[in-house]
């Protein structure tokens, strides 16, 4: 199945469908932004990022922006659910901008980008966390931006985007490193 984010029902939710576009199933339905989904290596689970406004004021702000085709990407948490949408579990709880989650090929760990350790909220680094939310580990320690991490299928390499070593302001480059456990 293919997993994706859509506004087809009025909110940014996660759906799955067969590769031919048939049998579309809505997997999330809480108010807020659910996006960036990826299947686990065995296809049994999905990792994604979500912003779930909780106060009346936050919901009104989110809804007004969404009506204009916008979102305010501020607080995003990482969630895991079963591939049928059941068992939705928040695995980060830090109020930061956590995004770009991707499964380690073992299927038990997730790598993602976050600004959780920068008081200004501007610097993003890569972090690894166990599927159950334990074992948080910081992977990169760089001023600036590290994001969009992806493992090679065999887990030997990590690829990510970064503005480290930028030749010009705002330049982002692709980096690859051997992954050593």
Indicate where each model-derived feature is located.
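Sequence signature of WD/YWTD-type beta-propeller architectures
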Residues: 1-181
């Amino acid at each position: 199945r293919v997993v994706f984010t859509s506004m087809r029902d009025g909110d940014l939710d996660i759906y799955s469908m067969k590769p031919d576009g048939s049998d579309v199933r809505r997997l999330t339905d809480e108010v807020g932004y659910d996006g960036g989904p990826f299947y686990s290596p065995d296809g049994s689970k999905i990792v994604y990022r979500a912003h779930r406004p909780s106060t009346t004021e936050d919901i009104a702000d989110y809804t007004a922006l969404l009506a204009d085709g916008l979102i305010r990407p501020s607080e995003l948490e990482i969630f895991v659910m079963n591939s049928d949408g059941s068992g939705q579990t928040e695995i980060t709880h830090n109020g930061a901008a956590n995004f770009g989650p991707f499964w380690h090929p073992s299927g038990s760990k997730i790598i993602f980008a976050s600004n959780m350790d920068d008081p200004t909220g501007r610097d993003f680094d890569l972090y690894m966390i166990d599927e159950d939310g334990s074992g948080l580990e910081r992977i990169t320690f760089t001023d600036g931006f590290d994001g969009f991490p992806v493992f090679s299928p065999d887990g030997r390499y990590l690829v990510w985007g970064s503005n480290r070593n930028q030749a010009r302001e705002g330049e982002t480059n692709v980096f690859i490193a051997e992954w050593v456990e």
